[in-house]
Amino acid sequence: MELRLWFLFGLTVTSAAGPVPRPQPGDAGRSGVPRAPSATKETMAMVATRGPSPRSSGQEQEPGPFGELAAKGGPVRYRARRCTCFTYKDKECVYYCHLDIIWINTPERTVPYGLSNHRGSVRGRRSAGPSPQSSQPSRGTLRCACAESQDRACVYFCTRTLAARGASRTPETPDKEAGKPAGRATGGLHPRRLKSRTDKARRL
């Protein structure tokens, strides 16, 4: 029993110490000298060739319009929410308004991760639409509520309904084609009857 405990203790100590490096072919006679890993050497060489980082030299970068850093390679901060969608099922609206959203798709449901970080009460979140006293269109015609009323692009996006988007994507037909019967040009049925393979086999 005691022998087993000593054996387990020895295994624990050796596993905590880490693996012993193998001697390389050109290391004859230097087996007792500890070597730095090659990855550490490469990292030190890269830092030495790059020089000091821009932050350490005192050059502070200014955040961009939504909080991200405007210049190269700096850490990106969380951007402000541009607007609040009335329904999270409208994915285009969610991607437009919530700029830092990550969607977690599971077989059971699609969860918008990060939307619960909204600052404000739950009641305020539910009543994100315009108040009944306002002269703006009703909630049925709006997709979202903009954080800033001066943001024209956001106001345009939020007032554009799903039906209007669908109508704007379909091309309008000129008046000339309106009177033509449905045929090949307009995507109607082919005038000849298509024959199946069995019909062809009966002929033979």
UniProtKB/Swiss-Prot annotation:
Q: Which UniProt keywords apply?
A: Cleavage on pair of basic residues, Disulfide bond, Secreted, Signal, Vasoactive, Vasoconstrictor
Pfam families on file: Endothelin
Here the segments flagged for biased composition (Low complexity) are 127-140
Show the segment(s) annotated as Disordered: 18-71, 115-140, 166-204
Signal sequence bounds: 1-17
Q: Which cysteines are joined by disulfide bonds?
A: 83-97, 85-93
Instruction: Determine the domain of life of the protein's source.
Output: Eukaryota
Residue span of region Endothelin-like: 144-158
The molecular function terms of the Gene Ontology recorded here are: endothelin B receptor binding; hormone activity
Q: Write down any Gene Ontology CC term.
A: extracellular space
| Prodomain residues | 18-80, 104-204
Record-annotated site: Cleavage? 103-104
Coiled-coil portions: none
Q: Where in the cell is it found?
A: Secreted
Described purpose of this protein according to its UniProt entry: Endothelins are endothelium-derived vasoconstrictor peptides.
By sequence similarity, the record places it as follows: Belongs to the endothelin/sarafotoxin family.
Q: What is this protein called?
A: Endothelin-3
